Amino acid sequence: MSYKKFDDADLKFLRDLCGTERVTARDEIGEDYCHDELGGTRARPDAHVKALSTDEVSKIMKYAFENAIPVTVRGSGTGLVGGAVPLEGGILLDLSGMNNFLELDEKNMTLTLEPGVLLMDVGKYVEEHNLFYPP
């Protein structure tokens, strides 16, 4: 796929949607967002956006699709396979702020949570309900 070059209009859209405090661009983006725990693979996104709701994620993804802007999704950056590294630039969609537990269904032994929840927090949460999560 051929991607469009990220520009100031794209940055404005993101900042209007999420606010300037949750959108950083280009050289403002810290090095931690240019790699994951794999090491060796580095790339800088054009924008880093910290989404806080599924509505924001949906609007960002729709805009990116309509404008041919690549999106790399990131949780907490602890991955070991390079999947959270923005190799094509574009938008780094940070979901670490979406860190709520939504539902524990003890009958079916399922847990519904947002993508920013850390595994160590899953363990603590289920222990409070006399359950065990083997990571």
Question: Which sequence ranges carry the predicted segments?
Answer:
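N-terminal accessory segments
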Residues: 1-38, 66-69
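N-terminal glycine-rich flavin-associated loop
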Residues: 14, 40-71, 95-135
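Short capping/connector residues at structural and topological boundaries
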Residues: 28, 38, 85-86, 90, ...
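Glycine-rich loop at the start of a catalytic domain that most often binds anionic cofactors/ligands
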Residues: 36-42, 63, 83-93
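Short glycine/serine/threonine-rich phosphate/pyrophosphate-binding segments
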Residues: 57, 80-81
